[in-house]
């Protein structure tokens, strides 16, 4: 699967992945094919009485259109509510919450340790992460799903998370005790059996490596010896040029025709899934991504009413429709939407 998408870049690559975050709003150009719909079982937002107040937020520069739509819809219902949002980039969510200068951070990736640790040191608990949108399938710089790729001549077609963990980690939190260092250990035979695996990735910390560490390595430690690049941009070419290479990357950045995307399964025995639009939109593909609103909520304490209702609106039928109308990110599946809404109670 190869997807090449032109992008109107405003002074930066990778706003959602931890690099060069002080940028204007970013939009893909030209408009992209899109086929997502909102699950009809997601509830329509029902207003509460007498809501007034103000909120201040910070957002990634890739989500501004969605935020604007949410604010417009919400303040039409509640004219006595004022919401202002700074485009500070995903990397500003943690620091602004820690400093108390933002009520929420709309962040287009997971929060990195260097962003979360000062918050935990100050408050004694982690920021509450509420998923409010799916990522994109393969839009450059817009929280694209993550894939593992190999050279097109490699006969391997699929791989499990425990196998990837044994290739990339020193801790092996997913249960395979010994490192996987040759292609034969993944079941390849003949000339491939004793050939070394050349593992590639991104220099840490970065939004891509943070996601892979959390979801594939089960928060383990990276092993020594992984070859890396400063961004994911060259990784497709690196794998295309090396018959024995493997790398994770964003699907949008896998542009070299001489690579192949592997199907993934979280556990042995699970079905192996490819990153099709349907699998990503329904969050079935194991490395589909989501976009979060982070807030400072002390465990056991209620959320500010205006903030609670704003997030509830984002998770409502109206809020998810705004995501579809933007035609970049995917709305949440109903079950995930319901789980995230429960966090507001």
Where do the language-model regions lie?
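Flexible loop/hinge segments at secondary-structure junctions
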Residues: 19-345
């Amino acid at each position: 699967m190869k997807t090449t998408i032109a992008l109107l870049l405003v002074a930066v690559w990778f706003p959602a992945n931890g690099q060069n975050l002080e940028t204007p709003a970013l939009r893909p150009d030209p408009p992209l094919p899109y086929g997502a719909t909102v699950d009809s079982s997601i509830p329509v937002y029902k207003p509460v009485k007498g809501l007034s107040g103000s909120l201040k937020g910070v957002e990634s520069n890739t989500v501004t259109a969605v935020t604007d739509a949410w604010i417009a819809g919400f303040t039409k219902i509640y004219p006595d509510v004022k919401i202002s949002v700074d485009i500070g980039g995903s990397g500003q969510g943690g620091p602004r919450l820690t400093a108390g200068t933002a009520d929420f951070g709309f962040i287009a990736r997971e929060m990195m340790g260097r962003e979360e640790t000062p918050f935990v040191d100050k408050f004694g608990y982690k920021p509450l992460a509420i998923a409010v949108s799916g990522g994109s399938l393969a839009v450059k710089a817009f929280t694209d799903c993550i894939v593992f790729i190999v050279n097109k001549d490699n006969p391997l077609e699929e791989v499990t998370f425990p196998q990837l963990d044994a290739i990339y980690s020193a801790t092996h939190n997913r249960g395979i005790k010994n490192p996987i260092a040759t292609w034969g250990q993944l079941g390849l035979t003949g000339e491939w059996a004793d050939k070394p695996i050349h593992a590639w990735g991104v220099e840490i910390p970065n939004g891509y490596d943070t996601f892979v560490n959390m979801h594939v390595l089960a928060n383990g430690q990276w092993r020594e010896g992984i070859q890396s690049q400063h961004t994911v941009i060259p990784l497709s070419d690196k794998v295309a040029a090396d018959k024995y290479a493997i790398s994770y990357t964003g699907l949008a950045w896998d542009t070299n025709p001489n690579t192949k995307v592997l199907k993934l399964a979280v556990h042995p025995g699970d079905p192996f899934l490819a990153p099709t639009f349907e699998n990503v939109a329904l969050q079935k593909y194991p490395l589909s991504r989501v976009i979060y609103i982070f807030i400072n909520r002390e465990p056991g304490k209620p959320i500010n009413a205006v903030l609670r209702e704003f997030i509830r609106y984002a998770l409502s039928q109206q809020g998810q429709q705004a995501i579809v109308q933007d035609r970049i990110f995917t709305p949440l599946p109903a079950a995930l939407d319901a789980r995230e809404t429960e966090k507001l109670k």
